[in-house]
C-alpha cells in the first residue's frame, strides 16, 4: 500500500499544486484585468479632461474674439457718430458764416448804395451851384430864378 499511498499522495499534491497554480493564475488574471480597466479609466479620464480643457479654451477664445468684435463695433460706431456730429457742426458753422458773410455783403452793398446816392446828390448840388454862379457871373440868369438861389434885398 505504500506505493498506492504514495501515488495517492502524489496525486493529491499534484491536485493541490494545480489548484494553487490555477488560483494564482486566476488572481494574476484578475489583477491584470483590474490594472487594464484602471489604465483604461485613467486614459478615459485624461481624454475627458483634455477634451474639457480644449472646449473651455475654445469657448474662452470665442468669447474673447466676440468681445473684441463688439468693442471694435462700438468704437467704430462712436467714431462714426463723432465724425457725423463734427461734420454737422462744421456745416452748421459754415452755413452761419455764409449767412453772416451774405448779411455783411448786403449791408456793405446797402451802405455803398446810400453813400453813392449821397455823393451823387452832393455832386449834383455842387454842379448846380457852380452852374448858377457861372450864369450869374455872365448875367445869364433869370431874375425869378435868382431870387430862389441868390436872395438879395431888391424888392
Curated annotation (Swiss-Prot):
InterPro entries: LEA1/2/D7/KIN2
Biased composition (Polar residues): 97-120
Stretches for region 2 X 11 AA approximate tandem repeats of T-A-Q-A-A-K-E-K-T-Q-Q: 53-74
Coiled coil stretches, renumbered: none
Biased composition, class Basic and acidic residues, residue ranges: 11-21, 28-39, 79-95, 144-155
UniProt-annotated stretches for the region Disordered: 1-155
Sequence repeats: 53-63, 64-74
Annotated tissue distribution: Highest expression is found in seeds. No expression detected in adult tissues.
Family under the similarity heading: Belongs to the LEA type 4 family.
Biased composition (Low complexity): 40-78
Keyword Repeat on entry: yes
Keywords: Repeat
Full protein name: Late embryogenesis abundant protein 2
Gene3D superfamilies documented for this protein: Apolipoprotein
Metal-binding found in the keyword field: no
Induction context: Up-regulated in response to water stress.
